[in-house]
Amino acid sequence: MNMAVHGLTGVIKSGDEANSFYHDAHNLEGCCDYVMANPPFNVDKVKAESTANAGRLPFGCPKENKHKEIGNANYLWISYFYAYLNENGRAGFVMASSATDSQGSDKDIREKLVRTGHVDVMISVGNNFFYTKSLPCSLWFFDKGKKEELRNKVLFIDAKNYYTKVDRTLNEWSEWQLKNLNAIVWLYRGEKDKYEALLREYKEALGRDNTFADQVHELSEKTKILRNEAKNAVELADKKDKKKTQAKYDKQLSEISENLAIAKEANWLYEKFGEGEYRDILGLCKVAYTNDEFKTGDEDSISIEEKGWSLTPGAYVGVAPVEECQKFIKNC
């Protein structure tokens, strides 16, 4: 139905043939330029023999239990998405946060995956990004066509504390927050022109030439003044005009609030990366080497190997300074 609504065509499988664990129904191994997926997390009771026979396991099959079942299918999905890529293919998918650091055969598979040099970016996502689940998750990105200078590196981004609160049970990334996360990746890849274009986009959206920090201050002060003005105006208005008066001020406050949100995101980005030079930011992003042999002499140099092949961003980026945490809470 979803494909029909969007005018798309495709081959839809059903029944046992549609079970990805036991069938490569579309014969995709090695064929895909891009893979995007949001698979079910932590699927259990997957038949080990049927799974092994279905292939697409370049790093081997997760260990089976005494019932000859795979107790957690997360690394089946991860293996499939990698296996589907062609020689320059790229993949991006959502995965349970536990998969970045799971042990046993999962760790062995993860080591083999990291050693390929094709893990590109790992991002931690906070709670409440799903409508039906409150648990955190991770975003995994593979790139078989990485630049040679990035081949033995992985960018880690911890975005658990970077979000917009929609309501009590739902968080999201705003349009500008998504652009900021993209900007970190652009700078890591040396795509400074894209970063500069985003700064121009911010300036055009705000329509001002003064610094982003100044704009945050000015708009914050303007908001305080207008709120007090609105409160007094509503109190002084005739009873029949109170709702109309409040609505007028609400509209003005909404417009200022929108600009303030944009200014805050612009300032958040510019404070960290200025005119466009990637750097590791404590508590936010860190570039790690895949193996010890590729580490530089820099005392801050770190490898995934020395972290026990963990792909958890928090293990690399560290903890943000207290003032940064307080600033984030204030902005929220």
Protein language model regions, located:
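S-adenosyl-L-methionine
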Residues: 1-30
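A conserved structural/catalytic subdomain of Rossmann-like adenosyl-cofactor enzymes
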Residues: 29-332
